[in-house]
């Protein structure tokens, strides 16, 4: 989970996210990167900030990896539980079961990242939307 100092300006925080994602990609050299598509957020300010951060993530992924796969919340729920309306707790329990963990991963963002990775593994990455070689 990437965190940034709350006392930094938003543009600096975005730059820190880009640098952190780039460093992770350079360190682990993934062949592919999977991300969750943005969902509607009732808080407009939060939604816009999340969209900016997501854009930085996508830019780093395409620029440094080349293969980016995106999954909708519905695709993730169906892949993990077989039910498109599963709630967050049900999905987290499936992560715990799939990975043989004694408890649900914390923080929630870590569990969310694992859900996306498991969805990508489960679907075989057949939904790629972007590919740059």
List the model feature ranges, each with a label.
Residues 1-133:
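Phosphate- and other anionic-substrate recognition elements at nucleic-acid/protein interfaces
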């Amino acid at each position: 989970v990437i965190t940034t100092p709350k006392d930094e300006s938003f543009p600096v925080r975005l730059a820190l996210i880009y640098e952190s994602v780039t460093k992770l990609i350079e360190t682990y050299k993934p062949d592919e990167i999977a991300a969750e598509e943005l969902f509607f957020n009732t808080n407009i300010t939060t939604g816009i900030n999340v969209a900016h951060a997501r854009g930085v993530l996508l830019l780093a992924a395409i620029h440094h990896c080349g293969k980016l796969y995106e999954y909708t919340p519905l695709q993730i729920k169906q892949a993990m539980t077989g039910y498109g309306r599963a709630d967050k707790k049900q999905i987290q329990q499936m992560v715990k079961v799939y990975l043989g963990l004694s408890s649900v991963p914390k923080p929630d963002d870590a569990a969310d990242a694992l859900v996306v990775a498991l969805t990508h593994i489960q679907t075989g990455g057949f939904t790629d939307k972007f590919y740059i070689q």
